[in-house]
């Protein structure tokens, strides 16, 4: 009997599920990073599919910086309750003691302490030897050259010159003393693939991805949403309601929205088909001096 060929999305799905099962089989204490964004939503859906009808053997880990959009935190807790997954949340206690934030300490310091150092703390505290993430190669140039199984040193640093060859769908999971692995099952997906899969599978995502009237101010050429009273307004600055949406989500003072009327999945996909700019154009931290994605990964960032 001749089976019909798999569609493009079916092939991507099968590859990702294979990688997730490989992680569960090869590592002692794996964990999945859950940032609450669209890629994390797809990863969670794939994780549930990979081990259905059982509960996934891999817990979720969220690094909370205390500056995420309120809708993100509400969505995170709701999805954890709906799916029954084991969700663990970590906030860097040192950052809390110093009251570190993007306004008071700047984007680079905030990202390093609350994200990078917080992630390293959580991985060490949990004894995790593999951390699954939703990074894709089409997002950014340093991620384009990263392996699916990305080996990290005992200090969680990424050495791009010291990685294993990956032939076809064969992955070497053998680690040296102190090493750990970051695993990226969505490596070969594109932003458009993600949205098409969300549409096909009816995957819930944070409403911030859809256009709606939101209070924003213009900062450095980007629309920054006034999500709560912690965002100080500049002299003469007044929030204005604009129809905006977000292509990527992070800490709200560091995440720029785009003008858009795409308030449905179909409209978002149609917008994607004609958009030529990077989805990370709204990540203000990417434009800070010395804050390139590769530099952050060398320091232990995901």
Curated annotation (Swiss-Prot):
The keyword Chloroplast belongs to this UniProt entry's keyword annotation: no
HAMAP family found in the cross-reference section: Sulf_adenylyltr_sub2
Homology family: Belongs to the PAPS reductase family. CysD subfamily.
GO molecular function, one term: sulfate adenylyltransferase (ATP) activity
Pfam families, per the entry: PAPS_reduct (PF01507)
Function: With CysN forms the ATP sulfurylase (ATPS) that catalyzes the adenylation of sulfate producing adenosine 5'-phosphosulfate (APS) and diphosphate, the first enzymatic step in sulfur assimilation pathway. APS synthesis involves the formation of a high-energy phosphoric-sulfuric acid anhydride bond driven by GTP hydrolysis by CysN coupled to ATP hydrolysis by CysD.
Lineage start: Bacteria, Pseudomonadati, Pseudomonadota, Gammaproteobacteria, Lysobacterales
InterPro entries (alphabetical): PAPS_reduct_dom (IPR002500), Rossmann-like_a/b/a_fold (IPR014729), SO4_adenylTrfase_ssu (IPR011784), Sulfate_adenylyltrnsfr_sub2 (IPR050128)
Protein encoded by which gene: cysD
Species of provenance: Xanthomonas axonopodis pv. citri (strain 306)
Record EC number: 2.7.7.4
Protein name: Sulfate adenylyltransferase subunit 2
Catalytic activities: sulfate + ATP + H(+) = adenosine 5'-phosphosulfate + diphosphate
Gene Ontology biological process terms, A to Z: hydrogen sulfide biosynthetic process; sulfate assimilation
Record keywords, A-Z: ATP-binding, Nucleotide-binding, Nucleotidyltransferase, Transferase
PANTHER family recorded: SULFATE ADENYLYLTRANSFERASE SUBUNIT 2 (PTHR43196:SF1)
Pathway: Sulfur metabolism; hydrogen sulfide biosynthesis; sulfite from sulfate: step 1/3
Enzyme class: transferase
Assembly mode: Heterodimer composed of CysD, the smaller subunit, and CysN.
């Amino acid at each position: 009997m001749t089976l019909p060929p798999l569609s493009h999305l079916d092939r991507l799905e099968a590859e990702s599920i294979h990688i997730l099962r490989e992680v569960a089989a090869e590592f002692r204490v794996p964990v999945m990073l859950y940032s609450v964004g669209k890629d994390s939503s797809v990863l969670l859906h794939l994780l549930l599919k990979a081990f259905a009808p059982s509960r996934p053997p891999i817990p979720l880990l969220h690094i909370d910086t205390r500056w995420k959009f309120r809708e993100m935190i509400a969505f995170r807790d709701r999805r954890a309750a709906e799916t029954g997954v084991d969700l663990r949340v970590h906030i860097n206690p040192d950052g809390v003691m110093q009251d570190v934030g993007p306004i008071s300490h700047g984007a680079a310091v905030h990202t390093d302490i609350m994200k990078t150092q917080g992630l390293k703390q959580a991985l060490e505290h949990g004894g995790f030897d593999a951390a699954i993430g939703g990074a894709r190669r089409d997002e950014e140039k340093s991620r384009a050259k990263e392996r699916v199984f990305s080996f990290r040193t005992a200090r969680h640093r990424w050495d791009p010159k010291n990685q294993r060859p990956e032939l076809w769908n064969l992955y070497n999971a053998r680690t040296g003393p102190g090493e750990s692995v970051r695993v990226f099952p969505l490596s070969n997906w594109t932003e458009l693939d993600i949205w098409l899969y969300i549409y096909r599978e009816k995957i819930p995502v944070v409403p911030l991805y859809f256009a709606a009237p939101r209070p924003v101010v213009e900062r450095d050429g980007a629309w920054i949403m006034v999500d709560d009273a912690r965002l100080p307004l500049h002299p003469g600055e007044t929030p204005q309601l604009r129809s905006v949406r977000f292509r990527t989500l992070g800490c709200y003072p560091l995440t720029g929205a785009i003008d858009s009327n795409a308030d449905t999945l179909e409209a978002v996909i149609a917008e994607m088909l004609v958009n030529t700019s990077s989805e990370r154009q709204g990540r203000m931290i990417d434009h800070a001096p010395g804050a390139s994605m590769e530099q952050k990964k060398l320091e232990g960032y995901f």
